[in-house]
Amino acid sequence: MLFRSERWSFNLQIYFLNKRFKDVVDISKNNEVIIQDRTIYEDARIFAPNLHAMGLMSSRDFENYSDLFDLMMSLVKAPDLLIYLKSSIPNLISQIQKRGREYEKSIRIDYITGLNERYESWIEGYKENLLVIDADRYKFGNKPEDFEAVTEMIDNKLFGLFPKVK
């Protein structure tokens, strides 16, 4: 969601943080395999810092938000596996255009580039179980062979000692 209001940025980020934390707590109580599209980390490590850098969240609000996030994370464990879809800017723009969401039509390329840089920086420092998938190479939503390759990568990362060699 894009907006230009310092007044609402903190409130909105707290809303998302609260919602995602509830999801994390619910997941921790469940023994089933759960796949999330968006993680709690993205709000705290990508979007809130971006709003702060853009001057849309005050330093005081950002510090309070970050402290609350750190406290919440001390109460739950990291996911069994974080999957990061690494993508070029042209591919990201293509995917956004394919979605056709009205509110995304005015997104600026420099905004997308900035978010992508934040994602790349954050993922480099992620210390838990991580699988990076080249989203420019693997079109797993359209190509069954790519879907199979990606599911095999996930399976190997979660359960395999030795990846299969083709």
PLM feature segments, named:
Residues R7-K77:
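Glycine-rich phosphate-binding loop used to anchor ATP phosphates in small-molecule kinases
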Residues I40-E42, S87-L92, R137-F140:
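Conserved nucleotide-binding/hydrolysis micro-motifs of P-loop NTPases
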Residues R45-R118:
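A glycine- and Lys/Arg-enriched "phosphate-lid" helix/loop adjacent to the NTP-binding pocket
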